[in-house]
Amino acid sequence: MLGKRKGKQRREYVPDYVLYDLETTGISSLYDEVIEISAVKVRNGKIVDEFSELVNPGRPIPYAASSVNNISDKMVENARSFEKVLPEFLAFAGDDVLAGHNIAGFDMKFLYRDCEKYFGQTLTNDYIDTLAIAKLCFPEWKHRKLSDLAEHYGI
């Protein structure tokens, strides 16, 4: 949802949330653009809905980004802009808690920026960053990538 105050980072379990991920043209929320947004809506541990859309960033996708996310200019040439896609994602998420890995340090910055840019308000949803939780649960680990967690839990 949109409003004047950003949502808070939470660390407690919530049964209902929207797990999401962004792919972008680079790592800077100042200069780079979203090229894909994907999400699942979870209710009591079960996926009940999905959202996924490629986004045309309005400029070429750098090779470095394409080599990481495997999204090419050809794939997004007929896609809509993030200005058109973002309202649909916001409607999908509603006022649910947002969740994802490293979203506090990355994904949320893009959402905050673009909500301000397109709507003049910020994203008010609370969020859970699984990277922050992994740091609390596994302080001795050198790395806490999503793949490390998946391997640890046999996923």
Model-derived features with residue positions:
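A short, structured active-site edge motif that brings together acidic residues
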Residues: 124-134
